[in-house]
Curated annotation (Swiss-Prot):
Name of the protein in its database record: Organic anion transporter 3
N-terminal signal peptide: none
Pfam families listed in its UniProt record: Sugar_tr
Record keywords: Cell membrane, Detoxification, Glycoprotein, Ion transport, Lipid transport, Membrane, Transmembrane, Transmembrane helix, Transport
Renumbered residue ranges of the record's region Disordered: 513-543
Gene: SLC22A8
Ranges facing Extracellular side: 43-124, 173-181, 234-237, 350-355, 410-412, 494-543
Membrane topology: Multi-pass membrane protein
Lineage: Eukaryota, Metazoa, Chordata, Craniata, Vertebrata
Molecular function in Gene Ontology: antiporter activity; organic anion transmembrane transporter activity; xenobiotic transmembrane transporter activity
Species for this entry: Sus scrofa
Amino acid sequence: MTFAELVDRVGSKGPFQLLHTVLLGLPILGMANHNLLQIFTAPTPAHHCRPPPNASAGPWVLPTGLNGKPETCLRFVYPPNASLPNDTRGATEPCLDGWIYNIVDRDSIVTEWDLVCSSSKLKEMAQSVFMAGILVGGLVLGALSDRFGRKPILIFSYLLLGASGSGAAFSPTFSIYAVFRFLCGFSISGISLSTAILNVEWVSTRFRAIKSIAVGFFYTFGQFILPGLAYAIPQWRWLQLTVSVPFLTFFLLSWWLPESIRWMVLSGKSSKALKTLRQVAIFNGKKEEGEKLSLEELKLNLQKEISLAKARHGIADLFRTPVLRRVTLCLSLAWFATGFAYYSLAMGVEEFGVNLYVLQLIFGGVDVPAKFITMLSISYLGRHITEGIVLLLAGGCILALIFVPLDLMTLRTVLAVFGKGCLSGSFSCLFLYTSELYPTVIRQTGMGASNLWARVGSMTAPLVKITGELQPFIPNIIFGTIALLGGSAALFLPETLNRPLPETIEDIETWSLRAKEPKPEPEAEKSSQRIPLQPCEPGPGPS
């Protein structure tokens, strides 16, 4: 009996699983708000230099740019030099007295701390700091999760996100705000890692994909909620606080969640694991089945996993053989390209000149059909074809934005939305594809290393946007080219459709060699080719 069959005995699709999914999914919904929060807490409104004290705002104070609008980062020197001829343009200087912002409906960290002109890089830096927190959190909390358990790390991460998110709302300076945002990203890694493991443990094998997709849709719905919250709460501090406080509630509710049964058995806590299984059986109305379970049966069902856990494998094993080297390098590039390009579009909503709230709803909504189409494609066309196509299409859309004039806002928006949908599909495909390509003995290591590259990409994306100050088209060239390279690399990966999962490193080597061998002609087909033709009996005519 396998562990999945053991879960079936205590109930794998009962009320416990429903409540378990909701309790894990609601924080994921809130996590989407934090990931995309800077879209609404850091928009840059139209602005120009504040005139010097006691000076009128005449044309000699605010120089006019080529577009006929006031310069955003320069003003005329005051008082003007009277010795200059009338046709001479006056000398200019930076905005020494601050800026005037065209604030229509909301404030932001940009308007509060003047993150414009020479300080505009700090806005992108804030998002990179947040992504760096996710990167560091994945490295630190992943290791702590293996040592102390999934549940303690999840509980700690809920508390840390609620506290650090609330702290960011009360930050007196940008530096303190950045520190709290780093901690927010750090805690988000703990939530996503622990949720991914706990989510699929309490269902049978055939329902794992459904439960995984169900929790994934909580993130999509979170993208719908954020624009509504931002529209109702125009003050960035209150918005930051609103999306953070619920995690203090999740912290209290998470004590009800059970620890990973596998982790408890592998950590020598089999008695506690058995007690948890019996509690789940009672909750699902299968008390008698729960009482029949024994410690010996539980250990026997997890004997294989216990043996695999004793074998030590590390990052170096991802490069041990030629096939694994190819898989690791191609997957790393695909993950990096996806995270890199995804956040370039997701965080660039305000660049398309469309209503910020409406466009974010569209950006969130495109994930629904994108994930559905991706699931159909990977089930029929295969994994590497699907992954290659969606990344190539995304790269093409980003590069096409270079050639579309700024006044064609509808076309630019369509390209961006389509590209973002392709990248969302790429994430969905990669999570499944990566788990199928790596053998069981290094699967968790491979997943962690691959996901790390997505975090590096998402952390780098805001910094690349700064190159737009040199030429507006440079960021899109970089984002689009990397996406094309990632899509091309995916095409060199072996196909996993309808193949059993490899258990050992030797399995994937043998598996790859078999894929290169010509398929033998089925015996039934050979026989059918040798069947002699027989005369057909005339059938009955129409009555």
